[in-house]
Amino acid sequence: MSHSLPAPPASLVQQGQVSHGRYAGLIDRLDWSDLPARHGKGRIWQWLHHKRWQYVGLATEQVFIGLAIVDVGWCHTAFAYVFDRQTRRLLADWSADGLPRLSGEVQDEPVLRAHSTFRSWGASLAIRQIDEALQVQVQAGGIDLEASLLLTQAPPFLLAVGPIEGGLSHATQKSPGLPVTGQVSVAGKRFDLNGAMGCLDSSNGLLARDTAWRWACAHGPDVGFNLQDGYFGQHENVLWLDRELIPLGAAHFEFDARQPLQPWRVWTDDGLLDLRFHPEGARQQDRNLGFAASHYVQPVGTFAGQVKASPDAPPRVVTGLVGVTEDHRSRW
């Protein structure tokens, strides 16, 4: 299927210049090692500001599962949760911190040859590309998850690369909706994940110490989207419609931060997306370590409204599209 975004560059840094832009397809590595010395950032600065993570979301009519492995340079962290959409409550919510390198890793390969792991006492998480799928394993906090996100015949992935105020640059690979096989056992229940819809977020950047964003992501067989308003501007705003990857304009989030389980509205200034989000529940966490702090809330729910492939195209009605929003602030 044709689209308006170019193919990815061979590398993030070419001839001393960062390849800023939006691209359709996969890049081998998210690697900043070729940044020239003229950027004036030493090794200690880069170590403190280099942030890498992989996030996976899995959605069915019964449950939503979210998990991530994060390398913030001076610390590793991970979380996993299972939300029961029928009872509207968390069946499990686990998180842990670990020492860099000793507790795991987030490698620079975002999709192909992806290999991210986290280990702590009695817990393990892994996201690996094996054969034609992303294999996801979680044994932590009462969650026993085995899932495969199928990569074959997938619509184009997004690669977004852009400058960061107070940092240097950021890059992310966002997946379209990916078919899932597998199962999860939690709280004495077993849920079949065959037929679920999954997504991957692989991000890697040299970010500012204070970073904030609003994010929304949802996927179905024919329509999906990724939106962000915050530190990365509109670089990662895209719509997948009938297997075509369509760049979107700036995203706007209308919600009550004090009551995140009230309805949200998300829309883009190009008129291609206008959706209402109805939360069913949320995972949230607030942490303050003095030198580092974070506020995080990720509601789970459904989107309804309309999207368009172009300003002159007829609107496509969206109903019951399962996904998440997020309000996140970090000092890291």
Language-model regions, residue ranges each:
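Structured soluble/peripheral alpha/beta segments that form catalytic or ligand/cofactor-binding pockets
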Residues: M1-W332
